[in-house]
Swiss-Prot record:
Its EC number is 3.4.21.92. It catalyses: Hydrolysis of proteins to small peptides in the presence of ATP and magnesium. alpha-casein is the usual test substrate. In the absence of ATP, only oligopeptides shorter than five residues are hydrolyzed (such as succinyl-Leu-Tyr-|-NHMec, and Leu-Tyr-Leu-|-Tyr-Trp, in which cleavage of the -Tyr-|-Leu- and -Tyr-|-Trp bonds also occurs). It comes from the Bacteria. This is ATP-dependent Clp protease proteolytic subunit. It holds the Pfam family CLP_protease. PANTHER family: ATP-DEPENDENT CLP PROTEASE PROTEOLYTIC SUBUNIT. Fourteen ClpP subunits assemble into 2 heptameric rings which stack back to back to give a disk-like structure with a central cavity, resembling the structure of eukaryotic proteasomes. Its main location: cytoplasm. The keyword Nucleotidyltransferase does not apply. GO terms for cellular component: cytoplasm; endopeptidase Clp complex.
Length: 203
């Protein structure tokens, strides 16, 4: 599949012009929303994206440690280690991180959605959530494959335990439900405990 050059994608990002006492100032739309403490986690979860999200979380904490941060998620998932860097930072910083699923939150995206502050995790009505076990595909010597298999089993157990804590579901239920791809509607995700509510309009 042909991928558009980054310069083309950047050109498609809208700019917002504000009038200030010193004249006009322009921001790309994401930078302007960052001023409102809104962060977008969109696309594959990987190291570069994780570094950007972590940096934004730390910046907003330094700006105002007592104000909530709003993390909007539309992601098919991705790297567990990159996702855990974001997750750990969400738990580490002082501000509550409110998570909102727009579109989809699958795999590590769903884990980050569930990792938001208690009572502040939301889905929009037509979003989809999917949980499953970590994926692994390894090649090489048998001993190396065995090492990787052991590692992924350890990660699976850790993620399941953490998901049980965030959802309130028994660990054995999480283990059963993540054995294969498990898709949920926004309402089902709320009933399961992955989010606290489904919101159609701002209050």
């Amino acid at each position: 599949m042909h991928k558009a050059p980054e310069s083309v994608l950047n050109a498609l990002v809208p700019m917002v012009v504000e009038q200030t006492a010193k004249g006009e100032r322009s921001y790309d739309i994401y930078s302007r929303l960052l001023k409102e403490r809104v962060i977008f986690l969109v696309g594959q979860v990987e190291e570069h994206m994780a570094n950007l999200i972590v940096a934004q979380l730390l910046f907003l904490e330094s700006e105002s440690p007592d104000k909530d941060i709003y993390l909007y998620i539309n992601s098919p998932g991705g790297s567990v280690t990159a996702g855990m860097a974001i997750y750990d930072t969400m738990q580490f910083i002082k501000p509550n991180v409110s998570t909102v699923c727009i579109g989809q939150a699958a795999s590590m995206g769903a884990f980050l959605l569930a990792g938001g502050a208690e009572g502040k995790r939301h889905c929009l009505p037509n979003s989809r959530v999917m949980i499953h076990q970590p994926l692994g595909g390894f090649q090489g010597q048998a001993s190396d494959i065995a090492i990787h298999a052991q590692e992924i089993l350890g990660i699976k157990n850790k993620l399941n335990t953490m998901l049980a804590e965030h959802t309130g579901q028994p660990l054995e239920v999480i283990e059963r439900d993540t054995d294969r791809d498990n898709f949920m509607s926004a309402t089902e995700a709320a009933e399961y405990g992955l989010v606290d509510s489904v919101i159609a309009k701002r209050g």
